Amino acid sequence: MQIILLDKVVNLGNLGEIVKVKDGYARNFLIPTGRARRATEAAKAEFEAKRAELEKAAAEKLAAAQAQGEKLAGTTVKLTQKAGVDGRLFGSVTNHDIAEELNKQGYNVVKSQVRLPNGPIKVVGDNTVTVALHTDVAVEVTVSVYGETA
């Protein structure tokens, strides 16, 4: 299926590009989330009419994400979990916990934006986590996990 991208999609293309994707990917993900439209002649004409408006909106989103990224860069998140003597946690620290703590600190972050490269954190110590605010803006945040003995 050929589609027109209404937003930048990682590993697929940028705003305004006409790309060919599998039908299921288009029907079940790209079109329902508003990232693409079917590439019919009417849709192409409508897109060209709205192109400047969509590019301006995309630039505003990028600028807002960059501004938030500058504030968020270098932030340290401190979390306390119950841990054993050897430093292993009884449970784990997930992207939900990190996003919740960042929201308490005043940053507007959704759990899907927090990227844990090695899965949930299961040991006490400092870890570096990536927060993807936009497809072009990713910020490194330090997560310090402290153990609390039972």
From Swiss-Prot:
Cellular component GO terms held in the UniProt record: ribonucleoprotein complex; ribosome
SUPFAM superfamilies membership: L9 N-domain-like, Ribosomal protein L9 C-domain
GO molecular function, one term: rRNA binding
Source superkingdom: Bacteria
Pfam families recorded: Ribosomal_L9_C (PF03948), Ribosomal_L9_N (PF01281)
Record keywords: Ribonucleoprotein, Ribosomal protein, RNA-binding, rRNA-binding
Any one biological process term the GO annotation gives: translation
Transmembrane segment boundaries: none
Family designation: Belongs to the bacterial ribosomal protein bL9 family.
Function of the molecule: Binds to the 23S rRNA.
Record-given protein name: Large ribosomal subunit protein bL9
UniProt lineage: Bacteria, Pseudomonadati, Pseudomonadota, Betaproteobacteria, Burkholderiales
Gene: rplI
